[in-house]
A protein has these predicted regions:
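Propeptide-to-catalytic entry region of secreted or membrane-anchored zinc metalloproteases
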Residues: 1-83, 116
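Solvent-exposed loop/turn segments at secondary-structure junctions
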Residues: 1-3, 41-45, 99-103, 119-121, ...
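Short pre-active-site segment immediately N-terminal to the catalytic Zn-binding motif
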Residues: 6-9, 104-128
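Extracellular/periplasmic catalytic domains that process cell-envelope and extracellular macromolecules
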Residues: 27-31, 85-90, 107, 186, ...
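Structural recognition of the beta-strand scaffold that forms the well-ordered cores
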Residues: 34-37, 92-96, 124-125, 131-135
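Catalytic zinc-binding patch centered on the HExxH motif and its immediate surroundings
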Residues: 46-49, 76-115
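Catalytic Zn2+-binding segment of zinc metalloproteases
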Residues: 129-145
């Protein structure tokens, strides 16, 4: 966001706060969350897109193609992040990038990133927030690589939302209502 984008930045903060706090479990707990935006103007809007030859002069140095993934959006400029973030107390740090391209990233207890202006931005924000806030794993149903490929046979994943059900039930079985099938069907077509 540039200085000229300040009004848009404020509106986007409100929009994404509503996207997060309008979904469970956050909707039921919204009195426990405080969302604040810190405007750190960039010289140019957007972010780097190295494989497309695009390099922007931005305050936080966000870039697509992180770790070799086209849509993975991260920054390595920890100093710039912490300088901007010190303006307010925080438990979770989300970096909103003024861009139309689909993408984001999330690293547990560090930060999460997302772009502001594509049809999936709200969904991506909540998804990446799950990584940064709760250390949740990806559950890409369309991926050719299953999360079970990342763990040796017989090893239960550390992430709270995935399981190999080594003892015949998911690790969250105590939180599941009676009669809920495992695996639980979901609204896959919406996503």
């Amino acid at each position: 966001y540039t200085t000229d984008d300040t009004a848009k930045f404020k509106a986007d903060v409100e929009r994404f706060a509503a996207a997060l706090l309008g979904r469970e479990p956050f909707a039921s707990l919204k009195d426990r969350f405080s969302v604040r935006g810190v405007m750190k103007p960039s010289q140019e809007r957007g972010c780097d897109e190295p494989t497309r030859g695009v390099h922007r002069n931005t305050a936080l140095g966000c870039t697509f193609n992180s770790l070799g993934s086209e849509r993975y959006l991260l920054t390595e400029d920890n100093r710039a992040i912490r300088e901007a973030a010190r303006a307010v107390p925080y438990d979770v740090l989300s970096i909103m990038v003024n861009h139309t391209r689909y993408g984001g990233g999330g690293i547990y207890n560090l930060f999460n990133t997302f772009t502001s202006d594509n049809q999936w931005s709200g969904y991506v924000f909540v998804h990446e927030f799950g990584h940064g806030f709760a250390g949740l794993a990806d559950e890409y149903y369309s991926s050719s690589t299953a999360y079970t490929d990342f763990y040796p046979a017989g090893v239960e994943p550390v992430e709270r939302n995935i399981t190999r059900m080594l003892d015949g039930k998911p690790k969250w079985a105590a939180l599941t209502s009676a009669g809920v099938p495992v695996p639980t069907p979901w609204a896959k077509a919406e996503h």
